[in-house]
Amino acid sequence: MHKQTHKRAFYTLAGCIAALALCVAASLFLLTPTPKAQDVTIPGTRGDIYATVQLPGKLARGEELPLVVLCHGFTGSRSGDGHFAPLAADLAAQGIATVRLDFPGCGNSIEPFTAYTLSNMTDDVESAITYMQQTYGTGRTALVGHSMGGRLASLYPQRRGGITALALWSPANGAGLRGMEFLNIDDFSAVEALAAEAEASGSISTWGVDVSGTLFTEMRDSDPNAALRESALPTLLTYTGHEGILSDTTQAETIAAVESLPDGRAVLEPFAEGNHNYLSEDAATAAALDKALRETTVAFLVEYLK
C-alpha cells in the first residue's frame, strides 16, 4: 500500500515537473526577442543585391521557417514607403522570416535605372529566395508586392514557380502597356508615345529617371491578371480609395481576377482614405492605414504559410 502511494506521488510529481518545464519553455519562447533586422548583400545574376533580412526569434525544433519576399514599387526602395520594416517585425513575431530588397536603380542599388526591368527584378527575387534557403533554410515562400512590385509578384509564380501565396498592394496590373498608365494617368496616348521613343532609342527620361525600352517591351508582353488566374494561388489584394495613378478599369479587372481564384480575396474598405502608397496627410489616418495594412497582410500570410 505504501509502495503504491509512493508510486502515485512520484508520478504526480513527475507530471507536475514536466508541465512546469513546458510552461517555462513556452514562456522563454514568447520572451525570446526578435533579432534585429540585418542588412545583407545577396549575390545576384548581375552583381550584388542590397537587401535587409528580418528573422523571427527561436523556432520550435524541426519547425519550418517560412519566408516572405517584400517587393517595392517603381522608383521606390526596400523601405516600402515606411510599411515594410514594421510588417517584417510583425511577421517575425509570427515566426516568419522576410527579405526586402532594392531593385535595380532603386535605394542602395548601384545599377542604373535602365536595369529596372521585369526580367531583372524576377532574377533578383529568385536570387533572394535562393540566398534565404541556403543561408537560413527557409521553406514555404510568399511574395508581398506594392504597385509595380505587385505586378512583378503576380507574374513571378508563372515564370519561376515555388511560391505558396501572394499579397498584392495596389498592383499595377493593367494588361500589357496599360501597366505603365501611372506615367500619365490622364493621357494614355502620351504613355504610348514614351514607349515608342524608348523602344526606338533604348531609353526615355521620365519621372526623373531613365526608363529602358526593354521595360516597356516587357510590360507590353505581360498580362499579370492572366498569370494570376493560371497560377491560382491564395492571393490577397488591396486597393485604396484614392489610387490616383491607377485607373478604375485596372482596379476592377484585377479585383475580378483575384475574386475568381479559389482562395482569392480583395480587401478594400479599411483603405478607403489612403492614397496609392497607403499614406495620408493626416497623421492619425496614416497610422490607421499602416496598422490595417499590416494586420490584414499578416493574418493572410499566417493562414497560408504556417
Model-derived features with residue positions:
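The serine-hydrolase catalytic nucleophile loop
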Residues: 76-88, 103, 249-250
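Active-site glycine-rich loops that stabilize anionic/oxyanionic intermediates
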Residues: 65, 72-77
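Conserved alpha/beta-hydrolase
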Residues: 88-110
